[in-house]
Amino acid sequence: MSLNRRQFIQASGLALCAGMTPLAAKASGNPAALPIPPLLESRRGQPLFLTMQRAHWAFSGDRKTSIWGINGRYLGPTVRVYDGDDVKLIYSNRLNEPVAMTIGGLQVPGPLMGGAARIISPGGDWSPVLPIRQSSATCWYHANTPNRMAPHIYNGLVGLWLVEDSTSKSLPLPNHYGVDDFPLIIQDKRLDNFGVPLYNPPSSGGFVGDSLLVNGVQSPFVEVSRGWVRLRLLNASNSRRYVMRLSDGRAMNVIASDQGLLPAPMAVNQLSLAPGERREILIDMSQGEEVTLTAGESAGIMDRLRGLFEPSSILISTQILTLKPTGLLPLVTDNLPMRLLADNIIEGSISRTREFRLGDSLPGINGAMWDMTRADVQTQLGRCERWIIHADTPQAFHIQGVKFLVRSANGRPPAVEDSGWKDTVWIDNDVELLVYFMQPSSMAFPFLYYSQTLELADRGSTGQLIVQSAM
């Protein structure tokens, strides 16, 4: 809808009085220091506590609003565990409605995955013991409540879950949390003039906002030492995909995807991050020049004026994070390692091929809505299958309990940053995946595969995966 003459005059007057932009836009001109979520580490014999509860947070300036949080703050603490650990995790629900939680990317059996079979009632707890038996990876824990995943994630039930192993600890990569190794949880929201998040699910497609938030604030900065800086990126938006660049055009070095390290660092000038995807990048700050990680073009003045009268899907600011180097260059700096892991090889033959069609116009997956009493896919532990997935509307897609390689996208080789093991992929028409089934599940505790456009998943674009142990 375009602005009529009266609206334009009104908007012009409001903008002049308010400094030419609404509150959400003004906040982008006053960058805040990047909030660093607290770090929770697994200790032998000590449980980890994650409590879902109401809290207060300021998305714009100092004006705090009531939100959902974990352990008393918006977004949860970063959890760090180690390959070989057995982690007792205690989820506590102190909200006034049922919540289900899961850990995206964690390789555990179906009974420990969470979700619909492990709904936590108000005042209730769930205390799984999680065997950590996988390579290093940046995972994430989040709400997975049936038909309520979109609003629960939007409200703030999200956090990072880091797995480390002997390889990741031995490599010369930045690993000092909050010093040269930073978690970035990226979301888009719509804020009113008091900084309160608004959520109105659309009748079709997924929700998009006009305010870009990183760790819960707009346009943050962080001071870093000169040298390599590691950013662990999570797109926790409901449906928006980001294409990221550095403001001065320098390259980013991608070192990891959803399921862990790539075989070798990949230098790229732009990087896609779909909902639910995680990537790790290294940025060389040794030259001592400030740089900003951005996500596309921001709204112009007419788009901002229009946003006073109608919801906008154009981001007011596209600044993700500004890196400000400080201090002197160390006498000795580590070179970027040429190799990180051995090449990805799938052992064994492809047991079968399956096709799936996602769509907004065609409800569900292959025309079927999610049914918790139906097994949509049954396979065996250790098998590899070819999955060909079509999407009428561009969207991300996630599979629990597996890892996969992207064999092709629209008939072409995948982007270089998609060369590693993954569990989430962006689909714009067609992708071909080689899916390796890592963990067992059952009808009582199935894995899910679903659209990562969360509103579509809540409407039924979800299927159930049963992985039977080999006889």
Curated annotation (Swiss-Prot):
Entry annotated with the keyword Repeat: no
A GO MF label: copper ion binding
Signal peptide: 1-27
Broad class of where this protein is predominantly found: periplasm
GO process annotations (BP): FtsZ-dependent cytokinesis
GO cellular component, one term: cell division site
Sorted UniProt keywords: Cell cycle, Cell division, Periplasm, Signal
Protein family according to the UniProt entry: Belongs to the FtsP family.
Function: Cell division protein that is required for growth during stress conditions. May be involved in protecting or stabilizing the divisomal assembly under conditions of stress.
Protein name as catalogued: Cell division protein FtsP
Organism: Pectobacterium atrosepticum (strain SCRI 1043 / ATCC BAA-672) (Erwinia carotovora subsp. atroseptica)
UniProt gene name: ftsP
